[in-house]
Amino acid sequence: MLDSFYNKNFFNRDTIGYLCDTIEQEQFQIEENKNQAEDKKKTRTLLVHRNKIKHIIKDLESFIVWVNDRHFGYDLYPFNDHDICLYNIYDPHGEYGYHVDTSRSDVWDMKLTVLVNLSTEKFTGGQFMIYNGVEYEVPELSEPGSVLIIKSFLNHKVQPILSGQRKTLTLFGCGPKIK
């Protein structure tokens, strides 16, 4: 059974630039680090309203549905204009410790975590790691434009950035709680 699925160079350099510019010009709300994430998450995160970028990410959403249908098989809700995406900016020393992605809702949960490397400059460090009985790196996410889809319940982290700036967009494939 697959833990992850990736597509290298899903977005080209021009689309990455356009997506970053669109997000950064909108001046979205900055996520407050609360609860246990406060000690783990050392990054700036903008809460991006999907409806502001849907014209740019529509092919990505179609790809997510295709990957889920063929490789994961979760019951997912359709993407919605009210969904929130996360735009993470990691500067030097920025990192995000081991965590899982989940909801506090009684009726829905996160099934898939989708990460897109939107870095517009070179960076060192920032390796994406998964722990599933053993720790391993997912080097495919290091390439700008690459997309990584993982099961949301997997422990994952971003190693500290040593130099440069790492940018990612995170979407979540959500669906009903398992009953």
Residue ranges, per PLM feature:
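Non-heme Fe(II)/2-oxoglutarate
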Residues: M1-F79
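Catalytic core of non-heme Fe(II) oxygenases with the double-stranded beta-helix
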Residues: V65-K179
